[in-house]
Every structure is written in structure tokens, then in C-alpha cells.
Amino acid sequence: MNEELKDLTPKQTVAELDKYIIGQNKAKRAVAIALRNRMRRLKLPEEIRDEIAPKNILMIGPTGVGKTEIARRLAKLSGAPFLKVEATKYTEVGYVGRDVESMIRDLMAVGYTMVKSEMQEKLKEQAEKNTEESLLDLLLPGSNKKKTAATSAQPQDVSQASSGTTISLPSVSSTAQAEEHKAQNENDMSGTREKFRVMLRENKLEDKMVEVTISPSMGTPTFEFFAGGSNMEDIESAMSNISSMLMGGAKSKRKNVSVKEAREIIMAEQLDRMVDHDKVTDEAKQRVEQMGIIFIDEIDKVASRSDRGGGPDVSREGVQRDILPIVEGSKVSTKYGVVDTRHILFIAAGAFSVSKPSDLIPEFQGRFPLRVELEALHAEDFKRILLEPKNALTKQYAELLETEGVKIEFLDEAIDRMSFLAADVNSKNENIGARRLHTIMEMLLEDISFNASEMGGETVKIDVAYVDERLKDIVQDQDLSRYIL
């Protein structure tokens, strides 16, 4: 488990989220407390620990205000397995489409990949040494003393001596000469190997062609059991794996590649061979069960409005009912084993522009006791978004263009103008929140981005006049802004 989590207080969590997300303090506090409570639970005695379930969160707010970003940053901050899904992609069990249990299988796959990467990172130094030796073996066959020692030091066949066959032993002088010659050859090969080692490290042999043997994946064979409504892609993938095992598995193949490509292939194979896959599976399963986070977006789209007539909708109320046992706690079969969902944190989010949270079935509402309403963004918020976050849009575009030698400077007056225009367009058209800034920045810098390769060494100052020249006519023409911005 991630030990650093134990020292992350709610205040520290909010402070970290503030580096990337502007405003929405209520939502930040809610997720920070939820994260801290998980660490508190892990410190309790086992008999009490199992009784404490996470308090799932329902985020309510218009699009583009930071719902998804809060959950994503929280997962990165905690090092917990995180999965974002859209509620609209699932259908009721028994109908064509993905069943809701597949989100647990996907989360387990995320956890496995995360833990495997961490373990491989710890083994990377040794794997690099092994890879270097393997490359030298390919470039200079027979130059590895360790590998050739066994074959060069083989004794005479004992069976010949016991059968009475006369064996002519070489004279002492000829033996000494042979040993001297052998030692000379070994020294020469050793010197050549070291020269090649230096050249490898200096990347002077990257284009040289070598023949490598590509082995099939070293992963542990796994089986997965599916419910009746499982996705056909999952079933086909599982059947393909089973068929491969029954047929004796995938075969190794030889391929001519450059040293650069061979290094990547051998490195991946070394890491895969060195890592303990059973240990990875156990650790990943523990992390998913104790620290996993699933963010269910567009939950408002599966809320059936009370004024809506017609029969049951398999992608609405049925999906809510199928999610209930997973949120409450059930055991889901995956190819890595059975996963208990009791302590996975679920964060559901939706704009609820057409429906209301009360349109969700009562049982579903009860599984998400914490409700947080996110506020709509205004011009002042947009200004802060353009300037304050570590990954602010203005910083991103400036860094992108600087790769071509073009320096961009955004004046404060230009930032104010862009913020006002974003808020103005949002108020007149669909309110898409901070995502409007992406469109405005693209339109604003379109000419510079297109001609950047010919503007090396130039400095461009973005002021109010430039912003108005590029955007004012589009913003004022409501019909045009609806289609362009």
C-alpha cells in the first residue's frame, strides 16, 4: 500500500488539489475527508475495519466545472487504482451491451498494470544490466566468459576410459601452449566485448542489425468467468486465451531488428521475467479492494424522469439497479481472482440539467449519502484558471510554441478579455464551463500555431487588440459563435 497516504491530511489534500483546480472548495473538502477516512479505517482492528464502508459521493454541477478533474487528481495524489466510466455505456444484465460488473474487471486491470509498473521500476537497474549483456551476446557470440566456461571446461568422456579404449593424452608442452592460446583468445574477446560495451552506452551501434528471439508473454495463465450479459469482446478475448493455452501457448519467433529495437524488446522481456506475477496480482487485488476509486460520469443520463412515459428502459433504471449490489458490496469474478467491492469508493457525477437527483431510484440515492453541488464558473474564475494552476492553459500553449522558438507573452488585459468572452459565450449559448477556454485559446492562437515554423526567434505579445481582432466578431455574432465557439 502507498505509505505516504498516512501523512496526507484533508488540508494537505485540498492544498494539492488547489494547484490544479480553481474553486469548488465544498467538493474538494468532501473528497479529502473521504480519502482520509479510508486511511483511518486501515488503522483500525480488523473486526471493526470490515464494518466501516466508504461514504460514496454524488457530485452535482454543470459540465466543465471540475467534477472529473477532482476525481482524477485525487487518484493521482493517492496512488490508488482509478477508473472513469460513463453510466450510459452500460445496459441491464440480459441485454446486449456491457454489464456493470465489467467496471470492476477494468478497475482490477488498472490496478494490476499499476502495481506491475511499480515493481518493474524497482527492478529496472538490474534489467538494464542484463539487457546490456544480452545485446553484447548478440553482437559478439561466444564472448561471454560465464556462458562459455561450462562448454570449454568439459572433461573427457568417462565412458570411453572405462571401456578400455586407449586415450592419447597430449604432452605437457602442447597442453601449456593450448592453455596459453586459449587465454590469449579470451583476453582478446574480453577486450573486444568491453569496447563494444562502451560503444553501446554511447549509442554508436543503434542502427546495427541483430537477430532476437521474441518470447510469448511470461504472465501467469488466468481464467475468467462471465455473467450472462457480459460483453462479447470480453468473452472472445477469454476464449482466445484458453485456446492458446490448450494449443501449447504462443510460439517464440526470431526477428531481425536494429540494436535500438532489440534493447526495447529484451528490456521488456527481462522485466516481465524478473517480476513476480503472483505477488503483483495479490498486491493489486488488495489495493483495488481497499483503495480503489470508480468515477461514474453522466449518472444523470440514467435517471428516469417522473414525467417520462413508456416502458422500462434497459439503459436507465435497470442500470441503476444493477449498480446497487456492486456499490453496496459484492464479489465479482475477474481474470485475476474474485474482487470484493465493499470498500471501493464510488463517485458519481452528473450535470442534472434535464433530470434531478431525486429522479434516481431511492435505493441508488441511499448508496450515495454525500451530495456535493459544484458551482458554475464566472469570468473571475476563468481568469484564475488561465493563470494559477500548474498546468494553466496559457503555460501549456507558451511551452508548445517555444519548442519552435516562438515566445508568447499574455498581457493581463488580454487574460481579462478572454475570461470575459468565455463567460459571455457560456451565458448566451450552452454553458460548457472551463472547456470554453480551450476553444477560445485555439481560435486565438490559430495563425501563430500555423506559422510557428517560420517565426523562430520572434516574441508575440497577446494584448486586448489582438484578442478583439481574432474573436470579437465571432462572439458578437451569436449564430456564428454557436457553431465556432
UniProtKB/Swiss-Prot annotation:
Q: Which domain of life is it from?
A: Bacteria
Query: Which intervals of the chain are annotated as region Disordered?
Result: 146-189
Instruction: Give the compositionally biased regions (Basic and acidic residues).
Output: 178-189
| Ranges of biased composition (kind: Polar residues) | 149-177
What Gene3D superfamilies does the record tag this protein with? 1.10.8.60, P-loop containing nucleotide triphosphate hydrolases
Q: Which SMART domains match?
A: AAA (SM00382), ClpB_D2-small (SM01086)
Keywords associated with the record: ATP-binding, Chaperone, Cytoplasm, Nucleotide-binding
Q: Which SUPFAM superfamilies match?
A: P-loop containing nucleoside triphosphate hydrolases
**Coiled coil ranges:** none
Give the NCBIfam families listed for this entry.
hslU, PRK05201.1
How does the annotation summarize its subunit structure?
Answer: A double ring-shaped homohexamer of HslV is capped on each side by a ring-shaped HslU homohexamer. The assembly of the HslU/HslV complex is dependent on binding of ATP.
Chain's role:
ATPase subunit of a proteasome-like degradation complex; this subunit has chaperone activity. The binding of ATP and its subsequent hydrolysis by HslU are essential for unfolding of protein substrates subsequently hydrolyzed by HslV. HslU recognizes the N-terminal part of its protein substrates and unfolds these before they are guided to HslV for hydrolysis.
Protein name in the entry: ATP-dependent protease ATPase subunit HslU
The protein's organism comes out as Treponema denticola (strain ATCC 35405 / DSM 14222 / CIP 103919 / JCM 8153 / KCTC 15104)
Q: What gene is it encoded by?
A: hslU
